[in-house]
């Protein structure tokens, strides 16, 4: 992996990026049998480190003679204590950041500098496989409105050779300006929130435009942070004119999975250990959905050990080194609460309704809220108002999915409310919040 000039800020801040590259290459060159032993050693090493040097984690585990299967599964709520409480005194220099994730509640986390350098090395490795790392990026993420954080983000954009588009204005006029921008600048790839890029592709569809014809230098599109449904991916590939690559990550951990050239969604097995567990914390068979639980094998600043990231998914293990993320089904706290008290995954429900509603009208975006067991609110952005017949048909399909009578309040909006960083929460059950 070739060292890039954009690593200079990391080096100046004391991040051992050279060492991280060498370590990552060494890991990737291990044989399968060597890799199996490597994982066992790293699991033991990170757990023992935090038990010996991290009083916070020691009190959670309560047993120095631990077994992997008996270690507690931690949630964000378990770890969300003051940073100085969960950082070992042995660690003097570390990286601090925060993420609101899907909850909207700020979550501060820390990584030791080597761990953070490994994250960057891993990102560069994945992006370099597609020959886009360090190339001109059209970036579709939100930006902090805090002046200091805003300036820092802009500085990062400059060093990382990227231009950040305003994802808080998704009007037709704004999209038109984006197209003009692409006609003037030689972007190599797009990178951003799935919902924003889907909306942009729908605008291109309405104008019968293909972005690559406007900007011939385009090679790839990388989507992340939100679910990317198959139909949306095909739409983006058609109107962007390039391959769409799925990325799945968590700021507090690392890059979790990244799509390779063969369209396999490869799990990052180099620095993370990923498990799929049932509600009793037992591993589920390959291909079966469960809670995604991850261990950061290198983070000595915070104990992200058997950490429930809050998502539902399934994997396929080819061998210890090669693990494929087969399905990502969304957040495990975003359930539709059914009349009999059982639950269905909210994004599955959202997808069914989305597929139906987009056939009925020129719908651009939808957002579903479950207000009560039998009452839903459906917000949508469209050039046309849904007719009473269309509303009735959608209501009937919702009843078929849920298997009981429900009422739906349809609200046509000019734009849907997003988080402060520009993400769209596509399904919410307010019942879960009580």
Kindly label every feature range from the protein language model.
Residues 1-98, 103-136, 143, 184-191, ...:
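Nucleotide 5′-phosphate-binding alpha/beta core
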Residues 50, 99, 137, 190, ...:
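Residue-level signal for inorganic ion chemistry
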Residues 94, 271, 363:
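Short coil/loop residues immediately preceding or within conserved phosphate-binding loops
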Residues 144-268:
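Conserved adenylate-forming
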Residues 162, 244, 274, 407-410:
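Generic structural signal for residues in well-ordered beta-strands
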Residues 190, 298-404:
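AMP-binding/adenylate-forming catalytic core of the ANL superfamily
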Residues 219, 223, 227-318, 332:
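Conserved AMP-binding/adenylate-forming
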